[in-house]
Amino acid sequence: MVCTEKALMDFGIATQVVAALEEAGLTVLVYDKCVADAPSRICDEGVVFARENKVDGIVAVGGGSTIDTGKAIDLVLSMGGTTIADYYHVAEPEHKVKIIAIPTT
């Protein structure tokens, strides 16, 4: 799953990443709801999207907030929870979903 902002899809930045992943033979889904200083709801919606689509990897394309959103989605998926709020006080979570970050800032 590519985790990004709608604007980066519109500008063609994230679409280049999607195209490269598809060219490599991967099936790519896009979650483009990331925003600056995202509320926990954005992460939780990403978790639902990823879980419904059986996502096994995340590529976060964007700035710090987008990368943080991707990492938060990874955390909830890996730990088996339903919301990021469940993990505010977890010191060392176990990560089962693979994540790659591509900073654009």
Q: Where would I find each of the regions flagged by the language model?
A:
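ATP/NTP phosphate-donor binding region
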Residues: 1-57
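Glycine/threonine-rich beta-strand-loop-alpha-helix active-site module
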Residues: 41-105
